[in-house]
Amino acid sequence: MSSVAIVRQMDVVQGMLHKSVIALAIVPTNRSLTVTGRKAYSVMLHLAQMQAAAGTESADGGFAAPLNSILRGFGATNSISSDAKKYIDQMVSTKVEWRPLSKSEQQLPLTFGIDGKEEGGSPAQITDELRIFNLLAEVRVYKRAGENWVTWYYPPSIREELVSPSRWAQVDFAVLRQLTTYCAVALYEICARYRDSPAGVTSRQHWSWWAESLRSSPTSKVRAWRKF
């Protein structure tokens, strides 16, 4: 059995998401990302992982689900349901910068030629990378038998790592539903990566890394956490 198949089996856990490290510490760069949009994104990731594990994703690489199943996944209210398309639009139009939680998570080799190797040497490893991408590449919203459905696609360069992650945080939707601010959701998801860490602590980061990773908007003021 391949390692991909094993990871996909692990992801099929009701109420739990194995969220890839590339979707944890993300910083919006061009517009705000709301707490509802971030929660919906996690639910859609979980649905995509379940469909990939069952082999039911579409032939063109997309994933589909009734809109109501996405909303129910994070306990949406009726008032949120009426604005669902707005939150889906956020995922397509919001560009985010990925902040690796540790240096070891910058795994991709730099490419210098056709073979991806420096002349006379082994592949060079990335040490400091700026990586920006949209959360979703494309979304289609339509009706099927009178019910609203959504089909979505991930950017091709990160699709497999999102659907079958090699490194992840285990996110509990029961906890996610109780969190009401973007900062709380972002902090929970990042810290969930270290739930089973022997040291019981996160990786060491500069305070500015945390301030930016917990912000929902590139224009919001940095919050002084000594003041509540």
Regions found by a protein language model. Give the residues of each.
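Charged, alpha-helix-forming regions
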Residues: 1-228
